[in-house]
Amino acid sequence: MHVIVGAGPVGTATALLLAERGEQVRIVTRRGTGPQAPGIELVAADAADPNRLAALTEGAAALYNCANPAYHRWLTDWPPLAASLLHAAETSGAVLVTMGNLYGYGPVTAPITHDTPLAATHPKLVTRVRMWEDALAAHRAGRLRATEARASDFAGPGSYGVLNEMALSRTAKGGTAYVMGDPDAPHSWTAIADVARTLVTLATDERAWGQAWLVPTPPPVSIREAARRANELIGLPAPRVARIPYPVLWTAGLFNTMLREMRTTHYQFAAPFVLDSSHTEQVFGLKPTPLDDTLAATAAGYRAA
């Protein structure tokens, strides 16, 4: 059995992939939501309750942290949830597989590789760093087995993030994309399907344990180029992409929680932000989904909606 905490795009994709492979899956969310499919059990529970989560994880081969607290609640929500996940993994013997991101690296001036150190200094970004450090310390102490997959901004149907919400959801219908940062800066976009495949691989391959891995991700393109290619793939002309000046973004953040939180990660879009996943690809034989395939499916979905 595999236990997944969270039923967002990543948790859902991972559960469906495991179920397709004949595995039994238990998804834990506060409201018991998630995909309805053979082999998938939906459980309503507070995953931050260590005893409850440990009971739900008993006998599991792997425990996947696919939770995604609202960004403005990271400092309050992540610590108890992370502690509960560690307790459940240690108690049950399940491999703890965490869906991570690139926030822990902080601003970078070169592509992020397997060897790039975690150097974030903002308290919210450091939260994710500490989560991994705590899991790694427990792994090295022999208390549990842990690994982590780190992806760039998500791409693909059903995913949330800058590419879909600020660009493709608008441009696929002939509208204008309004984006923060530099719309021409190269950026890595990771397909949700590739995240799921990587998580399942890390859970079942002992070579992955005790390390963090970058999810296979195609070559970077700017958000302007991504929107252009997406439109071309569904037969639309190149869209208009407008930049939101930082002072405007800052001011809008006074009235909108999400925009306010984007100030913290604005650096990821103000300059090239690139992921080099070649090490993961070489070790596990995984390859990223071609970006055009992901863009075409996403744009077609928005066009038809």
Q: What is each of the regions a protein language model found here?
A:
Residues 281, 289-305:
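Amphipathic terminal alpha-helices
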Residues 33-35, 40-91:
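NAD(P)H-binding glycine-rich loop region in Rossmannoid oxidoreductase-like domains
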Residues 159-166, 180-203, 210-214:
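Substrate-positioning beta->alpha
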Residues 227-274:
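Terminal hydrophobic/aromatic helix or amphipathic segment near a protein terminus
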Residues 10:
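Hydrophobic/small residue at the entry helix of a nucleotide-binding pocket
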Residues 24-26, 83-130, 147:
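Conserved Rossmann-fold NAD(P)-dependent oxidoreductase catalytic core, especially the SDR/UDP-sugar
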Residues 101, 133-158:
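Conserved beta-loop-beta element that borders a ligand/cofactor-binding pocket
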Residues 158, 186-193, 213-233, 242-250, ...:
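Substrate-binding strand-loop-helix patch
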